[in-house]
Amino acid sequence: MRQKLDRLLEQAQINLTDQQKEQLVGFVRLLDKWNKAYNLTSVRNPDEMLVKHILDSLVVSEHLQGNNFIDVGTGPGLPGIPLAIANPDKQFVLLDSLGKRITFIKNALRELGITNVTPVLSRVEEYKEQTFDGVLSRAFASLNDMVDWCYHLPNPQGKFYALKGIYAESEVQEIKNPIGLEKVIPLSVPELVGERHLVLLNKPN
């Protein structure tokens, strides 16, 4: 699995240390193990997890601006855990409303020695503890839902980072809250079939 990860990272031009690579492989092994009992992801094959979960998360890394981020509807820690491993200097809150997912994340953090992640069991609309430089998600079906439910989370300079498949301009026009479209970045994920985009949105000051 490590060789496959090395190859994917090279193709994506992502540079990580040996320790970071081992943490990513360890995370996939844990996810695969827990998935058999807890059904955390529909992806069953660890090699596929490397592409669809790890690389698909890591390609966002170079676009992150700021120091503290929240991953909303993180599921088993995606994209939050791969991004936290790749960015040990940044802080991440991983939010999910399902207990088994947060239990898995806590276990993974402990086993892998990841110290820059805070897992939180909460519904997004009820989480008002702090604001963030970036609100990340690949969980929302529509941009309007993401902005609507997470509007209280970015700080004045903060941005929404929405990970999408196909980007539809009409989705931005359907957003009800005041919002600015900063840019849409096509993402290239090695060995992943289909389009991926990062949509950057900001709240007008």
UniProtKB/Swiss-Prot annotation:
CDD domains: AdoMet_MTases. GO terms for molecular function: rRNA (guanine-N7-)-methyltransferase activity. InterPro entries: rRNA_ssu_MeTfrase_G, SAM-dependent_MTases_sf. It comes from the Bacteria. S-adenosyl-L-methionine binds at G73, L78, V124, E125, R138. Its EC number is 2.1.1.170. This is Ribosomal RNA small subunit methyltransferase G. It comes from Actinobacillus pleuropneumoniae serotype 5b (strain L20).
